[in-house]
């Protein structure tokens, strides 16, 4: 029977080592400490076959997060499935900007539109437990995953509601609306590359220029924000100027774009006047 070290060596001829390690930890249901203190022990046939099947799927391009059913985001371990977008590190910039606009003391109302796995809403709820957080999505399958994540992290005060963008808010107003909407143009060649090939198109593609959902979110914000409330949006690295224009056109003030850790435009914010 092969050892973990031997399996890793063979797998890294086909896939990246970091991916191989993640898949082996999943197949063995162990942590890295166990793996590297027991790297030379023979493994059972079932574990070996399970790992090799995962490697085969990864070699075909299937994302590691979908193969193991989880992805780390913020301080959370988030369940994901093919019904949800895979949370990405750059989206933590969106969470940071939202948190900067939510104080610790008061019960602010927050809406996360297009929540997917619930990663953004749950990260905010974890850091601001006094906030009233509503998370919406037009996918019932995604909301099921999001609700499972809330339960797993004891964040059962987060409310989930099915509906498309502002329709799900039922005319309510919020102190902060946050969203990581689809923002890739339908003709973008990146859609045929990497993990994007396997993620739900509805969570990625937004019209001919990638701005359709962002237009809806910008235009509808004043009717759903309380005076002084913030709209916080993620977008593509080359869309900052266009999104600022959308927010200005909608009548928001204090409009600004923030960069992610790779120094790329990633998040644009605007405030509802009247505060």
Swiss-Prot record:
InterPro entries: DNA_methylase_N6_adenine_CS, HemK-like, N5-glutamine_MTase, PrmC_N, RF_methyltr_PrmC, SAM-dependent_MTases_sf, Small_mtfrase_dom. It is an enzyme of class 2 (transferase). SUPFAM superfamilies: S-adenosyl-L-methionine-dependent methyltransferases (SSF53335). S-adenosyl-L-methionine binds at residues 114-118, 137, 165, 180. Keywords: Methyltransferase, S-adenosyl-L-methionine, Transferase. The keyword S-adenosyl-L-methionine applies. Belongs to the protein N5-glutamine methyltransferase family. PrmC subfamily. Methylates the class 1 translation termination release factors RF1/PrfA and RF2/PrfB on the glutamine residue of the universally conserved GGQ motif. This is Release factor glutamine methyltransferase. It comes from Xylella fastidiosa (strain Temecula1 / ATCC 700964). The gene is prmC.
């Amino acid at each position: 029977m092969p050892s973990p070290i031997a399996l890793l060596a063979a797998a890294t001829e086909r896939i990246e080592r970091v991916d191989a390690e993640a898949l082996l930890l999943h197949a063995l249901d162990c942590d890295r400490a166990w793996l590297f203190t027991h790297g030379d022990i023979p493994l059972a046939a079932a574990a070996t076959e399970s790992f090799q099947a995962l490697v085969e799927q990864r070699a075909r391009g299937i994302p590691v997060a979908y193969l193991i059913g989880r992805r780390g985001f913020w301080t959370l371990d988030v369940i994901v499935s093919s019904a949800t977008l895979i949370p990405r590190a750059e989206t933590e910039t969106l969470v940071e900007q939202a948190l900067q606009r939510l104080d610790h003391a008061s019960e602010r109302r927050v809406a996360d539109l297009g929540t997917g796995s619930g990663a953004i809403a749950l990260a905010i709820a974890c850091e601001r437990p006094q906030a009233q957080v509503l998370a919406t999505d037009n996918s019932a399958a995604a909301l099921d995953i999001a609700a499972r994540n809330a339960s797993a992290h004891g964040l059962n005060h987060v409310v989930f509601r099915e509906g498309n963008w502002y329709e799900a808010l039922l005319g309510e107003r919020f102190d902060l609306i946050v969203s990581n909407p689809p923002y890739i143009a339908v003709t973008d060649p990146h859609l045929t590359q990497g993990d994007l090939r396997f993620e739900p198109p509805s969570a990625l593609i937004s019209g001919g220029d990638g701005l359709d959902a962002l237009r809806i979110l910008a235009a509808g914000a004043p009717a759903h924000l309380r005076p002084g409330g913030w709209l916080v949006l993620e977008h593509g690295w080359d869309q900052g100027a266009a999104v600022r224009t959308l927010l200005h056109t909608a009548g928001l003030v204090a409009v600004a774009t923030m960069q992610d850790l790779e120094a790329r435009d990633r998040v644009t914010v605007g405030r509802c006047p009247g505060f």
